[in-house]
């Protein structure tokens, strides 16, 4: 399927001296890309050798994704030269790039929601390959690399973590010489990340060059042989990440000392949001929730951990009003709201930041100002949009959350993933909700922006808001949560104070092994 990869003798751990004198797999010289009001890439030059893992580090909006799009043929540079295996590279489309052996795993998934996994994978492969062959390869690669997914699943029914697996599988099936990974671990569990890294080391040892974008400094230090740092579209450093501390890498990335998340303890008040024995059906491919109960008090953050695809999406749908149930199953300020939709719950003081940015949290074709209308009830009066107020509010979000964009009239889809996430989070937080539901608050966000978002959530909590955060970042949950619960196969564990549980215990709970869970009971009954 696609061009085969020539095996080389390079070890998984790349050592720079081994490649001296070798023709670079990819060479960029003075790559420049301008958009109206911004220079995304400013005379960027870099090389990557066969078998090398090169990390690209930079803040949101530093130009990383634009550079990858240029290499992959999804964008054309205004200036500069690119060579691949010593020959000039002039690809104009991703299809041409794939033919040459360049594959990319996108940060914003390039999948068709209404097609199956097999059909999505087939779109990136040569014609003449049967669906049965593709399904077999998906299963084999999934088992080999820990990327299991049902080939018959329709993408719209998959969790974000499962969609990530589809993207990675699709890239691997083209047998690339150069694999570009844009935030590939943002929705993967620690166990899945370890499996992915094992896969990448194996591919590297086979001569595959890997360009790896990540905001997770520990991952860059673990995986990458070399790290190129971009700031404001320019290369500012090229370092051995293993020889640098995370603090030094963060300092190189943002140009000063990284911000810290402030500490503070909750002063919880009365219960303001409650779910009572809520069940929401799943399907053969989507995990529902079963008999879920949770009470959240004013002035506390409850974090919910769990491996992607264990019912988090259904839980948030039931909590936000996207899935309706009996009225008294969900209480908001002691009033039954189970039969009320998201708009009615929002008017009552509950706001929701969904997992999927584009198409769910924001309309990509609309401007940032127009995207404030979607949840800004104060921006509409008697059916008329208050445009000046909306524009002022959008600019306030941009300023407070350091969103990198020329102005508020830019389309949401033109922003980098991290900047769009900052805008969405800021839009909801600055509306001062009394109850806030957040799914993956810092997905794909750099360390500086993540600190801004986490501090904003803590300030909102201190102002008396009740907050539920669903995240696969266990460290993040321990950093901001007052209580932590775990979802597993649609069941929710008790929410316990974070001071009474360790990260290791949370990891065990993520397999359903909390005290008195239905899964431990089934295990004991079996014995």
Region annotations inferred by a language model:
Residues 2-527:
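Glycine-rich phosphate-binding loops of nucleotide-dependent enzymes
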């Amino acid at each position: 399927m696609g061009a085969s990869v020539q095996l080389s003798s390079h070890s998984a751990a790349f050592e720079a001296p081994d490649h001296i004198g070798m023709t670079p797999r990819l060479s960029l010289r003075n790559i420049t890309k301008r958009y109206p009001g911004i220079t995304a890439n400013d005379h960027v030059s870099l090389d990557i050798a066969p078998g090398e893992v090169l990390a690209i580090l930079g803040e949101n909006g530093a130009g990383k994704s634009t550079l990858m799009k240029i290499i992959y043929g999804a964008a054309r540079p205004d200036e500069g030269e690119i060579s691949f295996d010593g020959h000039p590279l002039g690809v104009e489309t991703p299809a041409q790039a794939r033919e040459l052996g360049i594959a990319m795993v996108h940060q914003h998934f390039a999948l068709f929601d209404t097609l199956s996994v097999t059909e999505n994978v087939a779109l990136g492969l040569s014609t003449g390959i049967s669906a049965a062959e593709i399904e077999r390869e998906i299963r084999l690669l999934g088992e080999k690399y820990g990327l299991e997914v049902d080939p018959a699943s329709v993408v719209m029914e998959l969790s974000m973590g499962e969609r990530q697996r589809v993207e990675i599988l699709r890239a691997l099936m083209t047998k690339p010489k150069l694999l570009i990974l844009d935030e590939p671990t943002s929705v993967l569990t620690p166990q899945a990340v370890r499996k992915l890294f094992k896969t990448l080391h194996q591919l590297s040892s086979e001569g595959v060059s890997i360009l790896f974008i990540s905001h997770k400094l520990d991952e860059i230090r673990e995986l990458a042989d070399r790290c190129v740092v971009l700031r404001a579209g320019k290369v500012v450093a090229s370092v051995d990440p293993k020889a640098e501390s995370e603090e030094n890498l963060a300092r190189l990335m943002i140009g000063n000392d990284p911000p810290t998340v402030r500490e503070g303890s909750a002063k919880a008040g009365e219960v303001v949001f409650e779910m009572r024995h809520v069940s929401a059906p799943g399907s053969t491919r989507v995990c529902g929730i079963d008999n879920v109960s949770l009470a959240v008090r004013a002035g506390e953050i409850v974090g919910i951990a769990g491996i992607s695809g264990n019912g988090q999406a259904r839980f948030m749908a039931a909590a936000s009003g996207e899935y309706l149930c009996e009225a008294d199953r969900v209480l908001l300020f002691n009033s039954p709201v189970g039969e009320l939709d998201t708009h009615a719950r929002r008017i009552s003081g509950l706001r929701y930041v969904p997992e999927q940015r584009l198409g769910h949290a924001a309309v990509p074709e609309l401007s940032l100002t127009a995207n404030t209308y979607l949840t800004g009830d104060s921006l509409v009066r008697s059916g008329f949009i208050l445009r000046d107020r909306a524009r002022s509010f959008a600019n306030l979000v941009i300023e407070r959350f350091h969103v990198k964009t020329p102005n508020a009239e830019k389309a949401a889809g033109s922003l980098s993933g991290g900047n769009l996430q900052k805008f969405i989070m800021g839009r909801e937080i600055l509306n001062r909700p009394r109850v806030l539901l957040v799914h993956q608050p810092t997905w794909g966000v750099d360390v500086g922006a993540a600190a801004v978002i986490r501090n904003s959530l803590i300030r909102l909590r201190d102002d008396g808001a009740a907050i539920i955060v669903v995240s696969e970042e266990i460290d993040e949950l321990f950093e901001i949560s007052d209580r932590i619960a775990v979802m597993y196969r649609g069941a929710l564990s008790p929410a316990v104070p974070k001071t009474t549980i360790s990260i290791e215990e949370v990891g065990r709970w993520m397999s359903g092994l909390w005290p008195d869970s239905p899964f431990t009971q089934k295990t004991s009954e079996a014995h």
